[in-house]
Amino acid sequence: MKKVLALVVAAAMGLSSAAFAAETAITPAPTATTTKAAPAKTTHHKKQHKAAPAQKAQAAKKHHKNAKAEQKAPEQKAQAAKKHAKKHSHQQPAKPAAQPAA
């Protein structure tokens, strides 16, 4: 890793590859008395994948319908009846006020 970094730095500074090779050839030899520690054992953790949800229609994803939508749809009406909802009053005509007999 250090050699790669040194190569990148040397290339950026414009040094020739011969000068770089001469610098790397003079590295000190490692002594035999040093002991290397065993590399730490790496543990690989497996990711738990969630089960994919069932595919739905695009409209169902965007618009969550309430329980009211499950009820039976009303009968279709004419276009005019949809626009002009008239309130029907089932009141009988008002009775005239009772006049006291004089």
UniProtKB/Swiss-Prot annotation:
Location of the region described as Disordered in the Swiss-Prot/TrEMBL record: 26-102
Keyword Signal appears in the UniProt entry: yes
UniProt PTM comment: Proteolytic processing gives rise to the active protein.
Ranges annotated as biased composition (Basic residues): 80-90
Keywords from the named record: Periplasm, Signal
Pfam (any one): Asr
Coiled coil: none
InterPro entries recorded: Acid_shock
Family: Belongs to the Asr family.
Annotated function: Required for growth and/or survival at acidic conditions.
Protein name: Acid shock protein
Recorded name of the encoding gene: asr
